[in-house]
């Protein structure tokens, strides 16, 4: 979670609030009746969500990682529990096993459609180079069966209609429709046709619904400004109308980070570009209703090196369209808002336990293999209490088999792995990687002369080394997914750490279609003999907590880049008054900041009401944004110094004056 920051305002050093204890992992639930997006601060891409009775279920893309297609369950849409993987492994040839120089990077299994019908859970999902696959189970916990469909249906979505017919839509821009056969594994003869022409402006990543007799299809547009075009019709035969603004441009102020275009070294990495709003915006998702009659939206957004994240949005129906967001700010989702009223409550928890001492006889659900693993070449039993990875031949980490990873966690986290290198043989390499392309790692190399610490960075092509006398070593990666940089350290006693190598730039690209994975690896660079093994005693993942709202404290506010604090009638310090649900009033001299009918903000005397209440939120990089409860818009300071409650949301470049930094007085 985000860290308790020392905020610097116009040259001042800010006073820090008390930092709460470190927590195990990001939780969207704030514990005060609100939640903060994303639902998980680790990659969960191409989400699809259903409700079955009082339970909600969620799955998403896993590409080449095994096991795949996680199934999560929730009662409140905010706190999710891992239930199962629908796919233990998908072994459809050498490329799925990293054999014969082949791989499935950027491919694999993706864009699942989750449905429940007549007592059976269905997940339809695409596989590159194969036909669409259908997974079925009578319980979300499994067991799941797999059957290939006879066609490949790009980014499909399935609707079990109330007349007994089963429709499937798929495609990019040009949307096609057909009926599925009774066994759901083929298209009905003569039923395929184009439903919506490319010129209508639909994207891909479809979600197909029938609501109150009307048909809806949500889609994902990823060119330039990302958004979610939605089509609707009274009948399947049309006419279909398309709305481009149901969810558009909501990036929570996040700009484009480092990007990589080349697939092989030397890698061309472009620097961050905050001047392009909407390039990280929410764009692929759908909607779901609650037992109480509310509607909520879910959608993924590109969040740079950490991967694509899933966000939750209140839905406001206007003129028959399910807009993400709130009245008077349609299409723009609040990052922090009141939790859904589902009629149920859940304790605060995360889906996974990230730290692992490998004491169990099975891998924890957080772990996934890079491609199909080689059974018999890894173990939790050969030496109880450790993960043993046998070194298999590979020229480098990209080609190494049995690399075990977990999705990296943002916005800032530290991963520490404990390695016993005594089992390595000359030519073996083992360690901790920030795996993507380009990747970086810190580890131990064994040569004929002994052990050496090494740190390699694929971005720069540089390797750094240090002598190692011990066989036991602690390997650490400090990750900042706001700046998208990382650094590596090591220790020989578990207490004192030394840096190795230069800071690593974590770039995002479509080479893997994934974010960074914190990964444990062991491979062998020689082929003259069988390799040894690496024993990992433990992995510890720690995160820095989000700052608390400074209730009861006097603060000053300033716009980044401006030299003076905000002033209202000469008042520059405001007491933060707790209004409940993460909302505040800002009080000074017996008055409160208040939003007038013209949306101009001024200091008004009297008690605080809706016009004086603001939802306290933060951008991903920790700047404060304040949403007026009266206008559902955000405060911004215009170039002349006036403050207005009329911003749809902060821009990534910060030039709109809609983000603030604060310090305690």
Predicted regions, residues:
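Bacterial N-terminal signal peptides that target proteins for export
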Residues: 1-10
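Polar low-complexity intrinsically disordered regions enriched in Ser/Thr and small residues
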Residues: 5, 14, 252, 346, ...
């Amino acid at each position: 979670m985000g860290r308790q920051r020392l905020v610097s305002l116009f040259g001042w050093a800010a006073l820090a609030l008390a930092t709460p204890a470190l927590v195990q992992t990001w939780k969207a639930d704030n514990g005060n009746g609100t939640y903060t997006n994303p639902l998980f601060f680790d990659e969960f891409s191409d989400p699809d969500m259903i409700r079955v009775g009082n339970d909600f279920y969620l799955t998403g893309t896993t590409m080449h990682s095994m096991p795949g297609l996680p199934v999560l369950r929730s009662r409140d849409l905010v706190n999710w529990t891992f239930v199962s993987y629908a796919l233990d492994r998908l072994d459809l040839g050498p490329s799925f096993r990293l054999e014969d120089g082949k791989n499935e990077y950027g491919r694999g299994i993706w864009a699942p459609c989750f449905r429940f019908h007549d007592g059976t859970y269905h997940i339809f999902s695409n596989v590159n180079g194969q036909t669409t696959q259908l997974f079925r189970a009578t319980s979300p916990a499994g067991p799941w069966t797999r059957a290939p469909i006879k066609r490949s249906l790009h980014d499909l979505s399935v609707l079990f209609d109330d007349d007994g017919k089963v429709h499937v839509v798929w495609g990019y821009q040009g949307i096609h429709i057909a009926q599925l056969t009774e066994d759901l594994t083929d298209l009905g003869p003569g039923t395929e046709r184009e439903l919506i022409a490319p010129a209508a402006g639909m994207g891909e990543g479809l979600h197909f619904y029938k609501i109150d007799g009307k048909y809806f299809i949500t889609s994902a547009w990823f060119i330039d400004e990302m958004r979610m075009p939605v089509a609707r019709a009274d009948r399947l035969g049309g006419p279909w109308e398309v709305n481009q603004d149901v969810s558009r441009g909501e990036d929570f102020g996040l700009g484009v980070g480092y990007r990589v275009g080349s697939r092989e070294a030397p890698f061309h990495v472009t620097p961050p570009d905050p001047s392009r709003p909407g390039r990280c915006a929410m764009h692929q998702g759908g909607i779901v209703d609650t037992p109480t009659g509310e509607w909520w939206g879910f959608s993924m957004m590109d969040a740079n090196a950490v991967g694509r994240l899933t966000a939750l949005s209140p839905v406001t129906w206007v003129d028959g369209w399910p807009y993400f967001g709130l009245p008077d700010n349609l299409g723009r989702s609040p990052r922090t808002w009141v939790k859904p009223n589902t009629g149920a409550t859940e304790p605060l928890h995360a889906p996974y336990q990230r730290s692992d001492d490998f004491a169990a006889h099975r891998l924890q659900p957080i772990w996934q293999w890079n491609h199909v693993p080689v059974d018999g070449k890894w173990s939790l039993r050969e030496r109880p209490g450790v993960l043993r990875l046998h070194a298999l031949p590979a020229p480098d980490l990209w080609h190494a088999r049995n690399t075990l990873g977990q999705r990296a966690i943002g916005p800032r986290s530290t991963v520490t792995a404990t390695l016993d290198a005594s089992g390595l043989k000359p030519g073996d390499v083992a360690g901790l990687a920030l795996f993507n392309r380009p990747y970086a790692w810190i580890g131990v190399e064994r040569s004929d002369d002994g052990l050496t610490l090494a740190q390699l960075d694929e971005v720069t092509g540089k390797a750094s080394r240090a002598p190692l006398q011990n066989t036991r070593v602690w390997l650490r990666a400090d990750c900042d997914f706001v700046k998208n940089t990382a650094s590596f350290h090591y220790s020989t006693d578990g207490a004192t750490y030394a840096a190795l190598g230069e800071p690593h730039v974590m770039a995002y690209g479509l080479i893997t279609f994934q974010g960074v994975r914190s990964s444990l690896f062991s491979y062998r660079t020689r082929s003259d003999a069988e390799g040894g093994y690496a024993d990992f005693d433990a992995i510890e993942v720690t995160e820095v907590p989000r700052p608390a709202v400074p209730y009861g404290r006097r603060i000053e506010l300033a716009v980044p880049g401006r030299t003076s604090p905000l002033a209202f009638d000469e008042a520059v310090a405001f007491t933060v008054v707790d209004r409940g649900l993460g909302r505040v009033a800002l009080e000074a001299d017996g008055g409160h900041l208040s939003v007038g009918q013209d949306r101009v903000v001024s200091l008004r005397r009297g008690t605080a009401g809706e016009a004086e209440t603001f939802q306290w939120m933060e951008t991903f990089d920790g700047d404060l944004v304040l949403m007026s409860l009266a206008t559902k818009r955000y405060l911004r300071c215009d170039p002349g110094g006036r403050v207005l409650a009329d911003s749809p949301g902060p821009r990534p470049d910060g030039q709109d004056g809609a983000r603030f930094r604060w310090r305690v007085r």
